[in-house]
Amino acid sequence: VVLLASGCATAPPPTEQMASAKAAVESAAVDGAPAYAPAETRLASDKLAAAQKAVVAKDYVLAKQLAEESQLDAQLAVRKMQTAKSSKAADEARKAASTGGTQ
């Protein structure tokens, strides 16, 4: 148990994970994910903010975990957005095909 506790205390700041999470959250926002996956986008932002607070508190293990979760939530938001856009485009194509272009 002592080794595990000392391993946590010497964990380095999760600089790479924080940068990746921030980039993923920003990219999701710019791409329009909040309109299609608001819950996932908000969760990603909230976890990133919590990770930043954990870094300030020097709880690097928690910060790394939250940053990784934030990145995954942002990626999920983007995937949901892409799925919704693809579905909408397919519906529009079917609609256009069924009218036979008689507009």
Protein language model regions, located:
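Long, charged/polar, soluble alpha-helical segments
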Residues: L4-Q103
